[in-house]
Amino acid sequence: MKKWLRTSLIVLTLFIAIGAIGGAIMMRVDPSGEGWGGAPMLDLLRAKMPWPDIFFKDFIPSGYVLLAVNGLPQLLAALLLIKKRYRVAPWVVLACGIILMLWIVLEWWVWGFNPISNLYFVFGLLEAAAAIYWLRDSKR
C-alpha cells in the first residue's frame, strides 16, 4: 500500500463521511428543510420517488438513509484505512465509491446536474479507481 494513496483515501473517506453524517443530522434537526434551503428539494423528491406520502413527508427518512448508505460506510472505510486493515479496506472503499456514484446518479435523476453533485460523483469515481488500482497493485 502506497502511503500517498492511503493518506489520500483517509482524507477523502473522512470528508465524505463527515459531510453525510452532518447532512443526516441537519435533516433530523430541521426535517422540513426550511432552515437550510431544502424545502424545494422535498417537493421534487415527492414528485419523482415512490411512496411520497410514506417516505417524503419530511427529510427524516432521507437523513437516515444518507447516514446508513453513505455516512457510516465511508466512516468504516476511513477506520479500516487508519487501522491498516489492508485485506478488507480496498473492498470497502470500492463499495463506497460505487454506492456514492449510484447515489449521485439518483440525485441527478431527481434534481438534475449541479456542481456539488457532480463533484461528489468525481469523489466516488476517485474512490473506486483508487481501490481498483490498490487491488491490482497488491496482486503483483
Where are these regions (language model features)?
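Topology signature of small-to-medium multi-pass alpha-helical membrane proteins
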Residues: K2-R140
